[in-house]
Amino acid sequence: MTKTDVSGLSQLGTKVDLPQNPEEAVLERVPSGHGGTDFVVRFTAPEFTSLCPMTGQPDFAHLVIDYVPDGWLVESKSLKLFLHSFRNHGAFHEDCTIDIAKRLVSLLSPKWLRIGAYWYPRGGIPIDVFWQTGSPPEGVWLPDQGVPTYRGRG
């Protein structure tokens, strides 16, 4: 078993105030320790919130982020704080989704990353946003994201 170097982390194991916006949030990474092995890391945020940039009303989504590391893992507390920083941030669903994915790609330079954002209906229309960096590495197991299509009462 490899020991992960956490000496450069500023948030793990300490009390950290919630960032007020995504630009203020600090994403951190740790070495993977499993170079040469392709595997999928999944983060699920079933209660993601942001604000509508027009009305200021809350928007809710179920996020699923999958990635294949290439040397780096996102530190989960920093990811949690980053995602929570959208709580008071006004942006359209598409912008929130793509901005989250691009920040992670910039930080980690993963072999592959995808995000599925399953937004709850606004005005009677659910908006689902999907993005990925390209084709996943051959041979990795990619489970279904497991979020059913919105059906309302039906």
Swiss-Prot record:
The alphabetized UniProt keywords are: Cytoplasm, NADP, Oxidoreductase, Queuosine biosynthesis
Which top-level group of life is the source organism from?
A: Bacteria
A single GO cellular-component term from the record reads:
cytoplasm
Q: Please list the coiled coil stretches.
A: none
* Gene Ontology molecular-function annotations: preQ1 synthase activity
Catalytic center residues:
52, 59
Q: Which InterPro entries match?
A: GTP-CH-I_C/QueF, NADPH_dep_7-cyano-7-deazaG_red, QueF, QueF_type1
Q: Does the keyword NADP apply?
A: yes
Q: Does the keyword Nucleotidyltransferase apply?
A: no
Q: Pfam families given for it?
A: QueF
Q: Where in the cell is it found?
A: Cytoplasm
What is catalyzed by this enzyme?
7-aminomethyl-7-carbaguanine + 2 NADP(+) = 7-cyano-7-deazaguanine + 2 NADPH + 3 H(+)
Where would you say this protein principally sits, based on its record? cytoplasm
Q: What is its EC number?
A: 1.7.1.13
Entry-linked HAMAP family: QueF_type1
| Family of the protein in this entry | Belongs to the GTP cyclohydrolase I family. QueF type 1 subfamily.
Functionally, this protein is described as follows: Catalyzes the NADPH-dependent reduction of 7-cyano-7-deazaguanine (preQ0) to 7-aminomethyl-7-deazaguanine (preQ1).
Q: What is this protein called?
A: NADPH-dependent 7-cyano-7-deazaguanine reductase
Q: Which organism is it from?
A: Sinorhizobium medicae (strain WSM419) (Ensifer medicae)
Query: Taxonomic lineage of this organism?
Result: Bacteria, Pseudomonadati, Pseudomonadota, Alphaproteobacteria, Hyphomicrobiales
